[in-house]
């Protein structure tokens, strides 16, 4: 493993240190080399890194990868790098591997490397929620989605929450009448964990709900973990295909805000 090059983005607090990790892999089956694909004049991964740096409250931010091509490009734009093993089968595995080397970290963020329009303000709110309430062991982000056609798609993950803002269920299906303006929210693939829960989560085998829905967060739901859902201002989606990337290129970027 090569030495890491962490870049601090806030004021470290050993009691509540927040570690942000952006997992990135080169060999995506639908879009090989996706993190390095150019978007608005920069590698897509750089947009994620820059938006994550704008978010407040993250004490250390690193990109986790097992590919030297990604590491080389990321170092060139100033990112901290953590080289992970080839054994990681998911982004969460990479995040957990980094977290094992950071025993001081209290909260660990999993920030997807294919979300170039990451909402910095929502990440700030998620970090604030985790810092403010030690009883929250896992958190995520969701948004109101006005595009009902999008909410009808199985490619869009929905979540319904209870009166206290905790997730009841996540699904790709038309959950709670989402396509008809029902109460379901559009889920964003950003997660915050207390470090002990993250390490435990990574050791759990996939559950039946996770396998049925193809949603990793249901592994926690099945185990009785309460997931706090922070409401963001505007939906943002990941890039899965070259066609989606081309559509973003044509449309242009949304504004960045730290909250």
Residue ranges and their predicted role:
Residues 58, 104-105, 133-136, 225:
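Short, high-confidence coil segments that cap the C-terminus of an alpha-helix
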Residues 3, 14-64:
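N-terminal glycine-rich phosphate-binding loop and ensuing alpha1 helix
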Residues 2, 62, 68-128:
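Short phosphate-binding loop-to-helix
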Residues 118-207:
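Conserved core of the sugar-phosphate nucleotidyltransferase
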Residues 2, 8-10, 182-259:
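Conserved alpha/beta core of the MobA/IspD/sugar-nucleotide pyrophosphorylase nucleotidyltransferase superfamily
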Residues 20, 61-63, 108, 139, ...:
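Hydrophobic/aromatic residues located in beta-strands of well-ordered beta-sheets
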Residues 53, 71-75, 221, 249:
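Class I S-adenosyl-L-methionine
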